[in-house]
């Protein structure tokens, strides 16, 4: 795809012989989705890949001597269970090829939405599915359209979800292409049934931009923040 002086960028076209380190991704759309590009790599090799990526950047961009990194840099710390760990998720909202309302992630290097199967991304917390299901059902019932970036029409652009692993607190923010979210009280009534719900807001973003969040936040219910502990 692109060649630099000391390295290049490439795209996988065909697998002739699978590596011994290749595994079957847990998510069926991992290959198309831009959310977890190395899920087909076994976890130990993922940690090694991330370690080397940081190391190479420190050498190439930071000018740190290799000998010093060999002496002080420790291996990447892993997890017992490398799923359900992300405390933040941003889902673009749109329609699939059949016209059905959907939430997902952008395919790599595009703005094509790859729907998350059953609205349940294996990297995010399980509560995300219930939240997305509630929002999509609300939009369907109330005839609220998703944002269309081609003609700048529609209302709901993204859904941002944050989760506090230590506190169990949940924040939901709908990014909208408008001043208000119609019938928001109905959505609030549904979302507040989810244990841990603490903050429900709207972010106003009416610009023709790739930037997700707007500059103005409307509080629909609860408080403007959640808390967690490190």
Label for each model-derived stretch:
Residues 1-230:
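Accessory RNA-recognition modules of RNA-modification enzymes
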């Amino acid at each position: 795809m692109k060649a630099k002086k000391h390295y290049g960028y490439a795209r996988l076209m065909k697998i002739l012989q699978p590596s011994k380190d290749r595994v079957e991704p847990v998510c069926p759309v991992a290959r198309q989705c831009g959310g977890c590009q190395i899920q087909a790599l076994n976890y130990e090799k993922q940690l090694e890949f991330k370690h080397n990526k940081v190391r190479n950047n420190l050498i190439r961009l930071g000018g740190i001597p290799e000998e010093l990194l060999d002496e002080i840099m420790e291996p990447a710390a892993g997890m017992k269970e490398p799923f359900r760990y992300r405390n933040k998720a941003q889902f673009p909202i749109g329609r699939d090829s059949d016209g059905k309302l959907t939430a997902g992630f952008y395919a790599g290097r595009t703005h094509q939405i790859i729907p998350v199967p059953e609205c349940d991304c294996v990297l995010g917390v399980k509560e995300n599915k219930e939240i997305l299901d509630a929002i999509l059902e609300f939009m369907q019932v109330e005839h609220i359209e998703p944002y269309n970036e081609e003609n700048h029409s529609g209302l709901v652009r993204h859904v941002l979800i944050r989760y506090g692993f230590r506190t169990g607190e949940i924040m939901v923010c709908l990014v909208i292409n408008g001043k208000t979210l119609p019938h928001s009280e109905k959505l609030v009534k549904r979302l507040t049934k989810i244990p841990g719900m603490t903050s429900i807001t709207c972010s106003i973003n009416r610009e023709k931009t790739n930037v997700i969040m707007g500059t103005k936040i409307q509080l629909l219910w609860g408080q403007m923040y959640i808390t967690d502990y490190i």
